[in-house]
From Swiss-Prot:
The keyword Hydrolase applies. Signal peptide: none annotated. Belongs to the ribonuclease M5 family. Mg(2+) 1 binds at E14, D60. It holds the Pfam family Toprim_4. Mg(2+) 2 binds at D60, D62. This is Ribonuclease M5. It comes from the Bacteria. The lineage of its organism: Bacteria, Bacillati, Bacillota, Bacilli, Bacillales. CDD domains: TOPRIM_RNase_M5_like (cd01027). The keyword Kinase does not apply.
Amino acid sequence: MEASMKIKEIIVVEGKDDTVAIKRAVDADTIETNGSAIGDHVIEQVKLAQQKRGVIIFTDPDYPGERIRKIISDKVPGCKHAFLPKEEALAKRKKGVGIEHASNESIRRALENIHEEMEAYTGEISWSDLVDAGLVGGEMAKSRRERMGKLLKIGYTNAKQLHKRLQMFQVSKESFAEAYKQVIQEEKK
């Protein structure tokens, strides 16, 4: 058996099934939010974990998961983020989306590509760059944002959140341009 990937930070997940999946894939400790009604005691746990070992927020690639990510991120600054593409988190019968459905390989890959929040960073990528790239409004915008989020490993979001994440994770103009070029090439096929 291969040596298990050891994670120093404490991983914030949504529930027990996510913890089981994480521990199956890597050697790590978790904090469970148990849904999107996050109690103050959970926020306090996450704050303490952030001070002692650091925190990686690893929630499901769906609306409740993004909501939980935002709540924790707002209340506990400086967290790291791991993202799982939606198609790697689908249940076998396509009923449900979650980390608990992901393969060990997908979980490890997401944890190898974590992003760190940077406070008060004015990024290189402007709102007009997103508009010019067809990522805001228009019939191709959603699918382009999905692809860009996957290529840049920052998850799928709406246009406003995409802009915020590009800033927060200090995505360079070069990385953005490379990903955009790939999206356009794929569309031509």
